[in-house]
Amino acid sequence: MDDKQFVVVLALPMDSDDAWIMVKNKSRGWEFPGGNLRTGEAPEEAALRELYEETGILGTAKAIEESLMLGGYVVLVRVEREVSPDPWISSDDSIEEAGWCLQIPESSAWGKEEIQSVLDHDWRTSSSLES
């Protein structure tokens, strides 16, 4: 029985690994998009749903990793949105704004090492979601 309860989304542009999307949670600060799995929901489905709910962006799930987060999955998602320094407003009431990051924000909800471990992960070693 799989006991993982949540997903974290590493959303990258289609053609680069130099920028990623984070959301500024009103109570926790900057973090990767993500949230709890719903009953019967596959991790990649939850990742795409959470990404859309928190950022308004659609993407394509490319790979999944089970070992990066205790109790959760990290899903690599590629998005067709141009990298821009301008943040945008989320329709999720708990999210102040969403935006592209080129470096780890100071007011992050997670430790810098934890964020860096997700950014540095070698996705070639993870389970591919591509056919």
Please provide the spans of the model-predicted regions.
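Amphipathic, alpha-helical segments enriched in basic
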Residues: M22, K26, E50-Y52
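Conserved N-terminal beta-strand and adjoining loop/helix that marks the start
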Residues: M1-W20, Y73
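A short gly/proline-enriched turn/hairpin at secondary-structure junctions
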Residues: E31-G35
